[in-house]
Design a protein with these regions (language model features):
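Alpha-helical transmembrane segments and immediately membrane-proximal extracytoplasmic
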Residues: 1-204
Length: 204
């Protein structure tokens, strides 16, 4: 029964990773299009070209807004939220996991500021949000420490796979960077979550 719970949680993490990738990507694009005023006609325009077409005043205003949201948002997060726990830290204490609401707020801040022009990368946000959802689900299922560690690592890779469409690279990322082991169970779990997340993102 315990193994069934684990593999159910891993498959669910793959689905969640794909959905998180879709939602966060669409949110980022919506913010980009709205902030810089392009793409309303449905025609594809790259972010770089869209920003270049915007007036200097609009670009300046968006960047000022970005700075205000980033500074104010992360100040509020630190003042009112629980301490942030990164994925690497969560893997060391998997039963402690990631604080759900704090992580979600942190992820949304990342996506909003990236959409407005912040140089932050967009790959951390889906990894963190997928891992936070997976931890919440794993805790409800009563997974033990080793199972939770595997789930958090695989969920993190699933978020990466969904955003960049790289299931095999994400599998290697989980095994090498997150877990540091190549057991049969770890390989199967990493591959399962990465492939499911990529498939869901492609369908979406």
């Amino acid at each position: 029964m315990g193994r069934r719970k684990l593999w159910f949680a891993l498959a669910a993490a793959g689905v969640i990773g794909g959905l998180v990738g879709i939602v966060l990507t669409e949110l980022m694009h919506f913010i980009q299009h709205t902030a810089y005023g392009y793409g309303a006609d449905g025609a594809y325009i790259s972010f770089r070209e869209g920003v270049a077409r915007a007036s200097e005043g609009r670009r300046l205003g968006v960047l000022i807004l970005c700075g205000m949201l980033a500074g104010g948002g992360w100040w509020l997060l630190k003042a009112l939220g629980k301490p942030l726990i990164g994925i690497k830290a969560a893997l060391k204490q998997p039963l402690q996991g990631l604080p759900f609401l704090t992580t979600v707020f942190h992820v949304l801040l990342q996506i909003i500021t990236v959409g407005l022009g912040s140089p932050l990368g967009r790959e951390v946000a889906p990894r963190e949000m997928t891992a936070a959802f997976a931890f919440a689900g794993g805790r409800r299922l009563g997974l033990d420490e080793d199972e939770m560690r595997l789930l958090i690592a695989c969920a993190s890779g699933a978020g990466l796979a969904a955003v960049y469409n790289v299931p095999l690279a994400s599998t290697l990322f989980i095994l090498e960077a997150m877990l540091g082991v190549w057991t049969q169970q770890a390989v199967a779990a990493a591959l399962l979550t990465s492939v499911i997340a990529t498939a869901v993102a492609r369908i979406g």
